[in-house]
Amino acid sequence: CDTATDYALAKAVGWDAKVILSVPCCQHELNRQIKNEILEPILKYGLLKERMAALITDGLRAQYLEREGYEAQILEFIDMEHTPKNILIRAVKKRHAKEDNNIEASIKRCEAALRVSPTLGRLLDGFATESANSEKDHPEKEDKEGV
């Protein structure tokens, strides 16, 4: 499945979902991409690299959701003894997406340091572009909502 969680999260954001609950299972993408000279002594061990990539993936997912106006939390929802995949991303819509230079800069620094380009970021950037183009093409929609 690889990036299925990213597509589901992007759809939820695109639909302006008020609450998003996601138990991500797909974190392989960054495992193939992640590179960092400082972390190389750790990343050379496949198991550790895989686990770090999974945590970084979910951390970035939460950051993208915050950038889009959600208050995001990452929680354990079941004991580790039952399954190692027990992370829940809970996001509640708090505001409209806006340019938050701190969140955006933080995301970009992390991506650059680890040399990763997550699918969710590209998908959400695509939605933002489509939304901006739609508003330009259909300004009457904005006028009706303002009445």
Language model feature labels by segment:
Residues 1-147:
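Class I S-adenosyl-L-methionine
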